[in-house]
Curated annotation (Swiss-Prot):
Keywords: Cytoplasm, Proteasome. Residues 229-249 are annotated as: Disordered. This is Proteasome subunit alpha. It comes from the Bacteria. Pathway: Protein degradation; proteasomal Pup-dependent pathway. The gene is prcA. One of its GO terms (biological process) is proteasomal protein catabolic process. It is found in: Cytoplasm.
Length: 249
């Protein structure tokens, strides 16, 4: 009688984690960052209908990378959960932290109990009355939750994008400057700079000053105009940097 093949729990969890990370890395990146007027979401996404960025509730939004059918199921579950909670209690009781905890429990259970983990990484963000009260939570494939500040990148080559963001990000930027920094980060995803057009970007924001529902998409002519302004500001900054370098020499 042959003995059953033994695999340690540690090895099983490691294999699951490696599998999920590889699946997430195959997708394109997304960026979330705070700016003066709220929270900006920018995703490298050529589809006009399969969204990576969506509204969850009045002040709360969702961004995701990885396998679309899996994070779309999470999004729909989050919307239903938020609607039910807001209807049963009060709309102000629906918070980003509450939704992040619910997602963490779901992903943690799938990772532990299922033979195949979900290949997703998500962000739940809630805009506050001031930048200090904004909340940004990253939830990974195993249910881990990280409270983020300022900016984050996920999916694709997230480390490269994060490094590019760190070079340019400053607190309390304008919306145009925040978009410029986000596009700069995504443009360096593969280690080489590439030009990103409005047709290949999905952009949305949680706008602090907007009444009631804070979520708004930026698309069409407005996005093209903002990208052009950001591109001109980027070129001006590079020209100024070259002049400063020449003066130093």
């Amino acid at each position: 009688m042959s003995m059953p093949f033994y695999v340690s729990p540690e090895q099983i969890m490691k294999d699951k984690a490696d599998y999920a990370r590889k699946g997430i890395a195959r997708g394109r990146s997304a960026v979330v960052l705070q700016y003066e007027g709220g929270i900006l979401f920018v995703a490298d996404n050529v589809s006009r209908t399969l969204h990576k960025i969506s509204e969850l509730y009045d002040r709360v939004a969702f961004a995701a990378v990885g396998r679309y059918n899996e994070f779309e199921n999470l999004r729909l579950a989050g919307v239903r959960f938020a609607d039910m909670h807001g209807y049963t209690y009060d709309r102000s009781d629906v918070t980003g932290q509450m939704l992040a905890n619910a997602y963490a429990q779901t992903l943690g259970a799938v990772f532990t109990e299922s033979s195949k983990p979900w290949e997703v990484e998500i962000v739940v963000a809630e805009v506050g009355d001031s930048p200090d009260s904004d909340q940004i939570y990253r939830i990974t494939f195993d249910g881990s939750v990280v409270d983020e500040r300022d900016f984050l990148a996920m999916g694709g080559s997230a480390e490269r994008v994060t490094a590019a963001l760190r070079e340019r990000y400053v607190k309390n930027m304008s919306l145009t400057d925040a978009l410029r920094v986000a596009v700069h980060g995504l443009a360096h995803e593969n280690g080489e700079r590439r030009e990103l057009k409005a047709s290949s970007l999905e952009v949305a924001m949680l706008e602090r000053s907007r009444p009631h529902r804070k979520f708004r998409r930026i698309q069409g002519e407005r996005l093209a105009r903002m990208l052009q302004e950001a591109r001109e500001a980027e070129e001006a900054a590079e020209a100024q940097s070259s002049e400063d370098g020449g003066a130093t020499d």
